[in-house]
């Protein structure tokens, strides 16, 4: 099943992600309007820097709380359905309910999924930092700083979807413990890193272009609206970041997630795991070591 086909067939998840993102956005806009109203009442500028700071902090807190709980479980259900679509070639009609049931069956409790996702994401961030350490070697070479910076950005985006791939792998290995399957999933990704990074090059360029377009178009529209309401362009710039983040979360991230998972699932079944890679990754990442320890705990139990 092609990436575009899976994307279209799982659009219900995309719309749910958009609804979630827009709910946060609308809440943020209401907060902005309240702060602007208070500023006008006290005779200050429409929205001064103090008001913008308060608004930005409150918006960030709301965004983090919603995405860390509701967003995580929605993503998990989406990943579960996509993993079946890639490996088995079908998408259930009641995909949302089926996805939730798969997550509940696989992880039992929400907490188990959150722990696994945090460990995988943390391991990815730590492994990404090794690129920065290598890049410091070339810091004195003229022009190399830009190359290293792009390389770090590229690696960051390319590895940013590993957690979805590893979570998807856990749904394909139902006979194994969730942490064991997740740990194996990370190892499989890095064992095939050269092949997968080649595919990720196109993905990275797509993410950069689409994210910029989402922000730029949103920014133009909101600047025009805020100027008409005399709210100033600074507020429009902040709002455009939130709105474009919601659009990216729903449309861009969903497509890239499916594309990355498909590339991963094509190589995962035929990969014979190199066991010394566990030890190497444990030395590079404390988070991966914690994940590996939990996997060993499952095997003992």
Segments and roles (model prediction):
Residues 208-220:
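Hydrophobic membrane-spanning alpha-helices of multi-pass integral membrane proteins
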Residues 1-211, 225-229, 234-235, 241-301:
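Helix-coil boundary and N-terminal low-complexity module in membrane systems
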């Amino acid at each position: 099943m092609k990436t575009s086909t899976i994307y279209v067939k799982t659009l219900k998840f995309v719309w749910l992600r958009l609804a979630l993102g827009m709910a946060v956005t609308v809440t943020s806009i209401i907060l902005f309007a309240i702060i602007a109203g208070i500023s006008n009442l006290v005779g200050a500028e429409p929205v001064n820097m103090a008001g913008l700071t308060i608004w930005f902090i409150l918006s960030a807190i709301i965004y983090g709380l919603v995405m860390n709980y509701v967003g995580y479980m929605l993503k998990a259900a989406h990943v579960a359905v996509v993993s079946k679509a890639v490996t088995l070639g079908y998408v259930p009609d009641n995909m949302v309910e089926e996805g939730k049931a798969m997550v509940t069956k696989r992880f039992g409790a929400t907490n188990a999924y959150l722990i696994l996702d945090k460990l995988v994401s943390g391991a990815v961030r730590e492994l990404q930092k090794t690129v920065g350490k290598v890049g410091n070697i070339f810091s004195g070479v003229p022009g190399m700083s830009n190359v290293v910076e792009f390389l770090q950005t590229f690696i960051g985006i390319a590895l940013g979807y590993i957690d979805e791939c590893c979570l998807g792998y856990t749904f394909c290995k139902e006979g194994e413990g969730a942490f064991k399957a997740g740990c194996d999933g990370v190892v499989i990704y890095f064992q095939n890193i050269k092949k997968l990074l080649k595919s990720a090059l196109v993905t990275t360029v797509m993410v950069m272009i689409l994210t910029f377009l989402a922000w730029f178009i949103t920014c133009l529209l909101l600047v025009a609206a805020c100027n008409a309401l005399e709210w100033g362009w600074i507020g429009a710039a902040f709002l455009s970041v939130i709105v474009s983040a919601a659009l990216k979360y729903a449309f861009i991230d969903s497509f890239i997630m499916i594309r990355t998972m498909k590339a991963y699932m094509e190589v995962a079944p035929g990969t014979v795991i190199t066991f010394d890679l566990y030890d190497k990754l444990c030395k590079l990442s404390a988070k991966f070591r914690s994940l590996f320890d939990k996997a060993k705990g499952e095997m003992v139990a």
